[in-house]
Structures are given as structure tokens and as C-alpha cells.
């Protein structure tokens, strides 16, 4: 877990791990490989292995795409499953994240914040990552929904063998979710 006050660089660290930002110094290793000096094309093979769950589920989902298209986009690009199995695979991921299959053809604006964050989680998990960077995944949600999402993340971590870099300003949340 990564804990710190607002503005201390927690999100920058998460995005730097993904090479969305270039570091000023230091090195980042993943599975024994140093990532900071990899080119864009060399980094491509890590795009499915490392995923990010954004802080704000309201702005991180494309409004003109259906839930099914949002989750399946990377599945198709990275050939996670054969084309004829994509819809069924995506619906299985949706179920794991607490989203009924009938949400497949609906749009993000039709959902609450908690449901949108479940869509974001499903999108991240759809490519079978080894590492998921959770950038304050509950800070934009109502307190009543925060516990549900944290419990979902913990359950998915245990059932799928996920490793999280959990970023938060709330020490108790990080303590609960981390090993």
C-alpha cells in the first residue's frame, strides 16, 4: 500500500509504474525487469500485466461506449480470448465484479458511482493482470458504497491471486486491503 497526504505524489507514482509518466530518477522493476528505460513498443507486453483502477469512476469511463464495449476493448486488442468467446468472457468478469449480464449493453451514465467503479474494476481485470494499481478507488464514492468496493477488491484479490499497489490517504483502508 501507498499512503500519503493529498498532493504528495501517490497518483504520480502509480502512473509512473505504468510509464504514463516518465520518472525523473530511480528505477522501477516488475518481475525482475527494469521498466523505466523500455521503449513504448517494449512496454507494450506489460500493458496487460499491469492495470490501473482510476480514482474517479465518473470521468474514467467513455460515455458513448456500452459497458460491454468498455470491458471488451482491451480483451480484443490483446487477444485474451477468441473473438467468438469475448461477450461470454466479459459477462463472466462482470459477474465476478457484481454486475449482472443485462448491464452489458447499457451506458455509464445509467449507473451509480459504485456500479461505475465495478465497471472500472472489471475493465482492469479483463486482461488477466498480475498487478493492479488501485489509485484511491473509493475516494470519490459515498461512504456506504466504499466498504462494498473495498470488500469486492479483497475478494477478487483472494480468488484471482491478484497483487495490488493500493494508493490511499486512508491508512485504515490500506491496512485492511494489504497483506
Residue ranges and their predicted role:
Residues 71, 121, 149:
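Hydrophobic anchor residue at the start of the ABC signature
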Residues 107-111, 115:
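Conserved ABC ATPase signature
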Residues 18:
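Helix-to-loop junction immediately C-terminal to a conserved catalytic motif
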Residues 126-130:
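A short, proline-enriched helix->beta-strand linker immediately N-terminal to the Walker B motif
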